[in-house]
A protein has these predicted regions:
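Preference for protein termini
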Residues: 1-270
Length: 270
């Protein structure tokens, strides 16, 4: 019996399923903290989730030294390209490398289909909500949301009341922060609707994985993501009624925490 400690910045726990018993698993101990603050040690059998099995087999066969070297190569690559970010609230303004993880978070096709439907529904609802707030305000008149909660919000723009936006679309791009809890269900932490950032890190991380771990992509059917900038450009062009519009990506400058993303997306969109 031993205690498994996941490596830093790793999806190790995500890969494992606490099965309770089973010959294929490994006996481990984990510590659980109750709502009252008491810490209990639980013994259980752990093994890879079904959709992680092929990756787990590869990870078992791969030498630790090889993984360490590839992780170092990833850090060196990111540093050379300048893929850094600053943490909000960090007074020192220290730039940090994007964290890389040799254990990817694997989402099955069925899970992604479920998430896609839910996110589409959520963004549609947000657009309907904003359209109502700036026009008929039925939700306020019905008392479903206190009027002062809307009108007292710093982001509420009175100048937008009655303004017709193209295609009734108030939110064209959104970054929805999602987590999966211990019960296996997905939860939304927050909706980033104004200037969502972070997609460039995902795109570069995928590119890095394909470069340093090509054998993984030969054995797995992984959906592509590199077409995102083209979809973004199409979305921005469709946000106006002007024929053949010119799209411009503005940035506060190189000292902004998301400057790498601004330059990356501008270059990718041409």
């Amino acid at each position: 019996m031993h205690t498994i400690k996941p490596p830093p910045a790793s999806h190790y726990d995500e890969m494992l399923a606490w099965t309770g018993a089973g010959p294929a698993g490994v006996q481990v101990q984990r510590q659980l903290q109750s709502s009252g603050g008491q810490v209990q040690t639980q013994t259980a059998t752990v093994g890879p989730r079904d959709h992680y099995a092929p990756y787990s087999d590869w990870l078992t066969r791969t030498a630790e030294q090889s993984l360490t070297q590839r992780r170092a190569q990833a850090d060196l690559l990111f540093r050379r390209i300048g893929i850094t970010f600053t943490v909000s609230g960090d007074d020192s303004g220290t730039e940090r490398l994007i964290p890389s993880d040799v254990i990817p978070r694997i989402i099955t096709a069925d899970e992604w289909s479920y998430l896609e439907r839910g996110l589409t529904q959520r963004v549609t609802a947000i657009n309907h909500f904003l359209a109502d707030i700036y026009h008929e305000q039925k939700i306020l008149k019905a008392g479903l949301i206190p009027r002062e909660q809307i009108e007292g919000n710093a982001q509420f723009q009175t100048k937008m009341i009655g303004v017709k936006v193209p295609h009734d679309t108030y939110v064209s791009i959104t970054g929805v922060d999602i987590v999966r809890n211990n019960d296996g269900k997905y939860y939304v932490l927050e909706d980033n609707l104004r200037v969502p950032s972070g997609v460039s890190y995902m795109l570069m991380n995928r590119k890095m994985m394909m470069r340093l771990f090509p054998e993984l992509f030969l054995k797995q059917t992984v959906r592509p993501v590199e077409h995102y900038p083209a979809l973004l450009l199409q979305t921005l062009r469709e946000a106006t009624d002007i024929d053949n519009p010119t799209v411009v990506l503005l940035t506060p400058g190189r000292y902004n925490s998301a400057y790498f993303e601004h330059t990356f997306l501008a270059q990718q969109m041409g």
